[in-house]
């Protein structure tokens, strides 16, 4: 019996495999699509772990000493995780709102701001001189507040005369201070874009310059006064980002019971501005927290506040924020 030499031979096909280029491209595309989905899921997981605040832009109206209520509103928004001061993109402030806005931009926490207000002897930040009224059109030069602003700037930036460009480079927050030019009748928006080399301290001093009380600021022969006169609520600056913007408006009640000259004086000013601001307030109602309540002993030129009164203003701010949250979120 003859054994064939081929019985135990294994034949191997060593020819090159063939691939369809179109199929390979499709497979690569599918892999990339799956990879993108994985990345998206990962991002969603991270976002859930690190919750983003709803609002990153903040608008703060004027309101004189009643601006303390802003702090209560902000505290409530932070507690509800609607706002995070460490993640702000932009802050626009007028008058008292400009002062508070500066503290926020400089990185103060809401607790630090509240402690600052409680420890501040408000009656010592003004030194009225009624002999100035005829010569300077005001009774208070605002020097004490101006020096306070520069001390605060120095403590956080090491630069007393810091300008808007420098402040933006340090903080990354778009800070806008609103002023009014009495000479040209123009509203002025001080920020790192429009006025990059303008001193922040001067802009805030201009913005808090309540007519009739603080003397106007003269720059180059032009007079500058309180930003609230021409735009007390600059929500218009964020018209394209309303979904990310929240504003706080300190409302003046329009009544006919004038106990002080200051109330009578402000009622006249409010009468001139009433129609304009009524329209503005309603236009941005969905983005506005209205603070309507104030203690009876608080009026615009009264800087002598005890801590009990400050606390009431703070609590009225919290109440206003609670009402806003209830109407906007809880009822949906």
Curated annotation (Swiss-Prot):
EC annotation from Swiss-Prot or TrEMBL: 3.1.1.-
Active-site feature positions: 95, 226
UniProt key word Transport: no
Top EC class for this record: hydrolase
Pfam families: Patatin (PF01734)
A GO MF term: hydrolase activity
Domain PNPLA: 58-239
GO biological process assignments: lipid catabolic process
GO (cellular component) term, any one: membrane
Family matches, as InterPro entries: Acyl_Trfase/lysoPLipase, Lipid_Hydrolase, PNPLA_dom
Placement of sequence motif GXSXG: 93-97
Subcellular localization: Membrane
Protein name (record): Uncharacterized protein L446
Organism (species): Acanthamoeba polyphaga mimivirus
Taxonomic placement: Viruses, Varidnaviria, Bamfordvirae, Nucleocytoviricota, Megaviricetes
């Amino acid at each position: 019996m003859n054994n064939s030499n081929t019985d135990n031979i294994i034949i191997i096909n060593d020819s090159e495999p063939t691939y369809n280029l179109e199929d390979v491209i499709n497979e690569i595309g599918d892999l990339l699509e799956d990879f993108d989905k994985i990345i998206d899921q990962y991002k969603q997981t991270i976002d859930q772990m690190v919750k983003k605040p709803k609002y990153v832009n903040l608008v703060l109206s004027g309101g004189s000493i009643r601006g303390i209520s802003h702090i209560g509103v902000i505290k409530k928004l932070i507690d509800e995780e609607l706002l995070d001061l460490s993640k702000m993109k932009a802050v626009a402030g007028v008058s008292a709102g400009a002062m508070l806005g500066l503290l926020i931009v400089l990185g103060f926490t809401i607790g630090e701001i509240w402690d600052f207000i409680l420890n501040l002897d408000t009656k010592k930040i003004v030194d009225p001189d009624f002999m100035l009224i005829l010569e300077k059109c005001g009774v208070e030069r605002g020097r004490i507040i101006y020096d306070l602003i520069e001390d605060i700037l120095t403590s956080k930036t090491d630069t007393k005369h810091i300008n808007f460009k420098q402040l933006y480079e340090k903080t990354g927050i778009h800070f806008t201070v609103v002023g009014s030019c009495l000479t040209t009748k123009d509203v002025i928006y001080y920020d790192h874009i429009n006025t990059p080399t303008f001193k922040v301290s001067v802009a805030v001093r201009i913005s808090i310059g309540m007519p009739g009380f603080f003397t106007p600021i003269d720059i180059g022969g032009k007079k500058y006064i309180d930003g609230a006169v021409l735009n007390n609520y600059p929500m218009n600056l964020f018209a394209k980002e309303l979904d990310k913007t929240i504003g706080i408006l300190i409302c003046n009640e329009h009544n006919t019971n004038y106990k002080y000259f200051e109330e009578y004086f402000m009622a006249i000013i409010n009468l001139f501005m009433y129609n304009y601001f009524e329209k503005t307030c309603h236009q941005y109602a969905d983005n506005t927290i209205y603070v309507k309540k104030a203690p009876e002993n608080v009026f615009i030129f009264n800087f002598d506040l005890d801590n009990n009164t400050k606390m009431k203003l703070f609590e009225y701010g919290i109440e206003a924020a609670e009402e806003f949250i209830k109407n906007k979120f809880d009822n949906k």
